[in-house]
């Protein structure tokens, strides 16, 4: 089980990403627009740098919803592989069966 502080930190990052998503998209569009003047693009770049680092979606880490484990997490379920295995063997995930061929 991951420390509670790490799990809470990820939740805080997710909130920041959601809060600044539109502003980041607008600034990045201005920066990428070749028709804008050089001064506008430069000022947009400076403004983007002023945003919090944790507002960048690349700083987010997928974690298991139950244990907080950062590795081996399946996006579809939001769970770590160990927990998927436990829950699947109990039959609590509909439509998920053990493979056999």
Swiss-Prot record:
UniProt-listed SUPFAM superfamilies: Glucocorticoid receptor-like (DNA-binding domain)
Alphabetical list of InterPro entries matching this protein: Ribosomal_uS14, Ribosomal_uS14_bac/plastid
Gene Ontology MF: a single term: structural constituent of ribosome
Any one GO cellular component localisation term in the record: small ribosomal subunit
GO biological process: translation
Keywords for the protein's UniProt record, in alphabetical order: Ribonucleoprotein, Ribosomal protein, RNA-binding, rRNA-binding
UniProt keyword NADP, yes or no: no
Record NCBIfam families: PRK08881.1 (NF006477)
Family to which this protein belongs: Belongs to the universal ribosomal protein uS14 family.
Functional summary from the UniProt entry: Binds 16S rRNA, required for the assembly of 30S particles and may also be responsible for determining the conformation of the 16S rRNA at the A site.
HAMAP family in UniProt: Ribosomal_uS14_1
Subunit structure: Part of the 30S ribosomal subunit. Contacts proteins S3 and S10.
UniProt protein name: Small ribosomal subunit protein uS14
Organism: Cupriavidus necator (strain ATCC 17699 / DSM 428 / KCTC 22496 / NCIMB 10442 / H16 / Stanier 337)
Designated gene of the protein: rpsN
């Amino acid at each position: 089980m991951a420390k509670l502080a790490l799990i809470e930190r990820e939740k805080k990052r997710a909130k920041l990403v959601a809060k600044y998503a539109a502003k980041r998209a607008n600034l990045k569009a201005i920066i990428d627009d070749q028709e804008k003047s050089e001064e506008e693009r430069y000022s947009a770049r400076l403004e983007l740098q002023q945003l919090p680092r944790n507002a960048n979606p690349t700083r987010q880490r997928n974690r298991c919803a139950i244990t907080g484990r950062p590795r081996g997490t399946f996006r579809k379920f939001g769970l770590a592989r160990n927990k998927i295995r436990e829950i699947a063997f109990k039959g609590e995930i509909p439509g998920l069966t053990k493979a056999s061929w």
